[in-house]
Amino acid sequence: MHHQKQQQQQKQQGEAPCRHLQWRLSGVVLCVLVVASLVSTAASSPLDPHHLAKRSFFDIQCKGVYDKSIFARLDRICEDCYNLFREPQLHSLCRSDCFKSPYFKGCLQALLLIDEEEKFNQMVEILGKK
């Protein structure tokens, strides 16, 4: 009887670290699953800029050649300008008329990019050619 009790105690003592390890592994697995689901959700989001970029190109009356990198660079200027001033309409005003609005030039000035204006004008011409 004493031997049986001793075996039972040893078994319980051996199970305690196993239970602790199981809980830790369960926590790690849960964290991995949560992170994986968040990453996949973010990657397939319909608000993904790459998904909307070409549509936006036509929405703002661009009639030239769609160049993803040029469009993204010019759009980034408008995003940065919006982030600087936090005016609700500024992003769309900056992009209007395929980046040919006075707001775009104002954003270049505000972001201290006016010395690169000629380069940006060439980019605008590529996107906005008729």
Curated annotation (Swiss-Prot):
Bridged cysteine pairs (disulfide): 62-98, 78-94, 81-107
Q: Does the keyword Disulfide bond apply?
A: yes
Residue(s) carrying Leucine amide: 127
Q: Which domain of life is it from?
A: Eukaryota
Q: Tell me the InterPro entries matching this sequence.
A: Crust_neurhormone_CS (IPR018251), Crust_neurohorm (IPR031098), Crust_neurohorm_sf (IPR035957), Hyperglycemic (IPR001166), Hyperglycemic1 (IPR000346)
Check the record and name the Pfam families matching this protein. Answer: Crust_neurohorm
- Which SUPFAM superfamilies is this protein grouped with? Crustacean CHH/MIH/GIH neurohormone
The record's section on PANTHER family has: ION TRANSPORT PEPTIDE, ISOFORM C
Q: Which GO terms describe its molecular function?
A: neuropeptide hormone activity
Cite a GO CC annotation: extracellular region
Q: In which tissues is it expressed?
A: Brain and corpus cardiacum.
Write out the annotated subcellular location.
Secreted
Q: Which family does it belong to?
A: Belongs to the arthropod CHH/MIH/GIH/VIH hormone family.
- PROSITE patterns documented for this protein: CHH_MIH_GIH
Gene3D superfamilies per record:
Crustacean CHH/MIH/GIH neurohormone
Q: Answer yes or no on keyword Ion transport.
A: no
- Predominant place of localization: secreted
Entry function: Stimulates salt and water reabsorption and inhibits acid secretion in the ileum of S.gregaria.
Any idea which UniProt keywords this protein has? Amidation, Cleavage on pair of basic residues, Disulfide bond, Hormone, Neuropeptide, Secreted, Signal
Q: What protein does this entry describe?
A: Ion transport peptide
* A single GO BP: neuropeptide signaling pathway
